[in-house]
Amino acid sequence: PGMQAFIRKFVNLQQNEFLDGSQILLLGELNCADLQQQSQNADVATLRSLCAEIDLRLEPVLLAIFEAGLTPIVIGGGHNNSLPLLSALAKNQQQAVNCINLDPHADFRLLEGRHSGNGFSYAHHAGYLQHYFVLGLHELKNSAATLAQLQQAGAEYCSYQRIFVRQELSYQQALEQCIDVVVQGDGDIGIEVDTDSISLMPVSAFTNCGISVQSAEQFVYQLARLPRSRYLHLAEAAPAQHPSGLSAGLNEAGQVLCALVFAFIQGKQHQAQAI
């Protein structure tokens, strides 16, 4: 649904001095209809097995995209797809990569079978993910076990409460802090956005206590300017979750996804020479 919402809006944007459509390739979507069918009334073990099957289907597609020298913009779909993105990029680079995730949840939960809450912990355990930073983590939406695992992995975060409630630092200072972490070493960088982080966005975990669309655009733009950032992943859009129904959700999700994609494209157009 996120992809359909995006396409409806994106194809109606203008080509002008700010956007060159000839540099954009639309590749389509991964067909998971058979897995979706099998998931009906399935138990937890089966659902986790089906999620792992998505990993196996998606990784070779992404690896081919990276090996072609292209920069994928992946519109989900769940945040489980972070694992095949990171594994494909790491295999393309033949080394562990770094990642910054704008997300109220760290998605660093236990290795208990695959689901959308443990893509990054699986990637770290497999040696695909080195430096990991979570921006906007919500202090009460992550278990003690998750926070302990983050610390053990050497991952870092700057919480939503620290920035917006206690105001210990500005949002721009937090962005600079996360950039300092993910530019360490020489590994490529993945840009992850869980759209659950955005207030009133129709998503799988709807919130009115999140960041603005503008703050998310600012995040994407500044990370896209890094020469080593290699992909953008926009996860968890769910138009049907809009309080006013699917039609309103498609409209709103499409607008937000387009804004974030354009921020990424502009960031790449204005890419810094070397960081």
Where are these predicted regions, by residue range?
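Catalytic cores of soluble, metal-dependent hydrolases
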Residues: P1-I73, N81-S82, K91-Q95, Q149, ...
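Short, glycine/polar-rich helix-capping loops at beta-to-alpha or helix-loop-helix junctions
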Residues: K141-Q151
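Active-site histidine-anchored catalytic micro-motif
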Residues: L56, L62, F66-G136, L140-N142, ...
